[in-house]
Amino acid sequence: MNLLVLDGNSIVNRAFYGIKLLTTKSGYYTNAIYGFLNILLKLQDTCHPDGVAVAFDVHEPTFRHKQYADYKAGRKPMPQELRAQMPVLKELLIALGYTTVECPGWEADDVLGTLAAACRDSGDTCFIATGDRDALQLAHGGVKVLLARTKMGQAVTDVYDEAAIAAEYGITPQALIQVKALQGDSSDNIPGVAGVGAKTALDLVQRFGTLDAIYKDLDTLDIKPGVREKLRRDKDKAYLSLDLGTIRSNAPIDAAPAHYAVTGGDPAAAVALFRKLELFSLIDKFNLDRDLVPGGETEAPAPAHQPERLTCVDADDLLTRLRKAGDVYVVPQMAEGTVTDLFFPLGDTVFVMPADTPEFGYFVRTLLAEDTVRIFGYNTKELHRLAQKQGVRCGNICGDLQLSAYLLRPSDAKYDLAQLALEYNVPVPAYRNSLDQEEPAVALAVILPELFAKTDALIDDAGQRKLLTEIELPLAGVLARMECAGFDVDKAGIEAFSKKLSTRISTLTDEIFEAVGHEFNINSPKQLGVALFEDLGLPCKKKTKSGYSTNAEVLEGLRSAHPVVEKIMEYRTLTKLKSTYCDGLLKVIDTDGRIHTRFNQVETRTGRISSLEPNLQNIPIRTDLGREMRKFFIAAPGCRLVDADYSQIELRVLASISEDQTMIDAFNSGADIHTATAAQVFGLPPEMITPQLRSRAKAVNFGIVYGIGAFSLAKDIGVSNKEAKEYIDSYMHTYQGVAAYMQRMIDAAKDTGYATTLFGRRRYLPELAASNHMLRAFGERVARNMPIQGTAADIIKIAMVRVDRRLYAERMESRLILQVHDELIVEAPEAEADRALQIVTEEMEHACDMAVLLRADGKIGQTWYDAH
C-alpha cells in the first residue's frame, strides 16, 4: 500500500504563516485549518495514498529533553491564534477518516521514523510530507520525503530519495545526521561543534563519513588545524548532537501501515464542523454532501416539490406572471462575459428566457422599464447592460444579492450563489433535467428569495441599507453604461508607438550585449545577475537561493556603478510598456474601434472600483513615455473629453474626520497643503519652503494616509530612519487632531472588530487580536487608513451616480466613460463639453458635506493626455 505520513506540526505551521488570518463571523481563526487541509488534498493528488497518518507533537517534554535540558530552549511559544485551531483540526481529520498519531515522550519526527521503518520492512511505499529538512535522513529504502518550501514567494514541494540526496549533498541520507551533529541546529538548540558551519560539516562527512571515523584518526586526517582543535574541544557535544538529531524508529505506536487506511469517517460531523468554521468550499473539495447533519440524515428543509424548469416560449405570458408576482427574482446566466439566459424563480418553477429567442429584446425592454414590479437580482450590472443595449434604463432594480454579500463580507474571494448558499445555510434542492443531468443553476435560482431574506436582515443589522441602496445599487447601472460606452482609441497611433518602442528596445539590446561582452537573455533574472555580478564584476549586495537579485531596488542602487545599468532599467521600462500596454491594448480593441473595459464592484476591501480586461486604471503616468499612452485614448469624432480630478481628496477626508482644525483651516484658506505642512513640520515660513522640502512634506502627508512608518518614509524620500521618525513626530505634534483620530480609530476597531467609513462600509480586522506583533501592527495601520481611503472611494462613487443622473436628467448625449481612482472622464459632444465640465465638477465637489470643501479640477481636451 501507499502510506502518506504528514509531519502535522510542520505542515500546520506552514499553513498558518503562509495564509493571511481568516476568521469566522464570530472571530474564530481558521487559516491554519484551511491551509492544512488544502495541502493535504494536494498531497493526496500527488501520492494517491491508501493510508494517511498525521503525526503531531505532544505538548510535554520528550526523552531528548531528559538527555539535554536545553533542547529546543528559546523556541517561541505557538501563537494563540494557531493553538486555538489545533484541537479542531485534529477533530476534523478524524471526522474525515484520517488517523492522527501522538506519542507522549516522543516527537512527531520519531513517529515519522517508526512508520517509515515499518513500510521498509513490509515492502510498502511511504511518503513523508514535512517542511523540516531533518526528515531527509529517512529518505532511503523506498521512503520518499516530500519537502515543502517557499521559492520566489511560491510554495513548492521537492521530492527526495537516495538519488536526490546524493545529487544535492554528495552523501547518503543517513549521513545527514552526521552533518547535523557537527554543525548543530539553532532551531532545536542542538549545540554541534562551535565554529563548524554547514559547509565545513558537509565537507568533513563527504570525505570521512562518520563522527567515529573522524575522531578515530583526528590527529592524522587532512583537517585544518583550527577545525581540528574545535572538533577536539567539542567532541562530547558532537556525539550528544548526533544522538539528539537521530530520528528514532521504535516509537511505541501501532506501526502497521494497514492501521492507517483512510476510512469513511463521520461525514455529517465533518460537514457540521466545516459549516461552523465557515469553510464551505472544503465541503465540496472533500466530496461531502453539504446537506448532511449529525446523525447521518440529510437536512430536511429542501422544498417538498423538486424544481421544475420551463423554457419560455411566450414573452407576454412570462411578463404577466412576473407582474402578478410583484417582486421579481432573476439570475442572469453567463458564458464568456455574455448573458445566455435569464432565470426567474416563481415558487418551485424556474422560468428560463433564453437570450437567443426572437422575443428576448422585447422582453428585456418591457420588464426593465416596468414600474409595477420590483426586481431583485444577482449581479444586476448585467441587467443594466442588457437594458443599455436595448435603449432603456432600469429604474426598478431594488436589490442585488452579490452586492449585499460583498458589503457583509468584503474580504471574501468570491460571492457565487453556491458559496452563499453554504455560508447562509440555505439548502439547495436537487434538480436533474430531462437527460438526467444535474443543472445546478436551476436549483440555485430557486433559493434566491431565501438568500435575499437572510442577507437583507444582516444588511439592516449592520446599518448598511443606505450604502447599498443609495450608492452600490445605482452605481451598478452607471458602471454598466460605462462598459457599454467604452473608450475610443487611436489604433494607428498605438501601432506606430509600438514600432518606435521596438526600435529603441533593439538598440538598447545591442548596447547591453556590447557592454557585457556577449549575448544573453536580458529578461532572465538569473542570466542578468551573472552578466552584472560575474561578467562585469559589479558589487553584489543581495543574493537569494536561486541566484543574484536584479529587482528594481537593486538596479537603482547600481545605477552609478556602470552605464549599462541605466540601459537595462530603460530596457525593462520599454519592454513592459510595449508588451503590456501597446500590444496588450491592440488585442482588445473592439469592432467599434473602442476599448470596453469591465469594472469590478466587488473586489477591493476598501470599496474602490477596479478595472479589468483591460485594466485602464493602470495606464502608466509616472514617466514621460508612459504618459504618451494617454494620447491614444481619444474623443469620438465631433466629441471632446471632459476630465475632472479630485484635489487631494484623501487628505481632505482626513482633515474632516479627524476634526483637526489646523489642517481644516489650511485647506479652507486655499493654502497649498503640502507647503503648509512643510512650514509647520520644518518650522519655516511658507515662502522659505523649497521644492525639496515640499516634496518631503507631501510624502509625509500621504504616508500618514497610507499608514507607512519611518522606515518606509525614509526609503521613499532618501533620508535616515531617524530623520523620517522626526518628520512623523513633528507632523503628529502639528496636527494633534490627526494623532488623536488615529488612536480613536484603532480603539474603535478593536472594540468592534472592524474599521468603517463615513457611509458605513466595513472592513473586518481579525489581525487586531493577533498575538503576532507584525500582524497586529498591520491591523492597526488598516484601522487608521481604511476609513480615509474607503470614505474617498465612497465619495467618488456618489459623484459618479450623481453625474450620470444629471446628464440623463438634462437630456444630454454626454456620458461617463471611465473612472480612475479620483478621476472621472466624460465623453461629450463639442457643443455640450463646457456644460458637462460644469456638471461633473459641481457633482464631484458636492458629493459629500464635510468640514473641508471638496475640490475638483477639470479640463477639456481631444485626448486623455490633453484633458488631464
Predicted regions, residues:
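Function-dense linear segments that define catalytic or interfacial modules
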Residues: 344-348, 408-431, 440-442, 447, ...
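Conserved "right-hand" nucleotidyltransferase catalytic core of DNA-directed polymerases
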Residues: 234-358, 375-378, 395, 443-621, ...
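C-terminal polymerase-core module
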Residues: 503-510, 514-566, 733-781, 785-787, ...
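Conserved RNase H-like, two-metal-ion catalytic cores of nucleic-acid enzymes
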Residues: 3-4, 8, 14-53, 69-70, ...
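Short hydrophobic beta-strand that contains or immediately precedes a catalytic carboxylate
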Residues: 5-6, 128-130, 329, 398-399, ...
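Extended two-metal-dependent nuclease catalytic cores across DNA- and RNA-processing enzymes
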Residues: 22-23, 73-250
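Conserved catalytic core of nucleic-acid polymerases
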Residues: 429, 484, 582, 592, ...
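Active-site-proximal helix-loop-helix substrate-binding element of RNase H-like nuclease domains
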Residues: 99, 152-180, 187, 300-305, ...
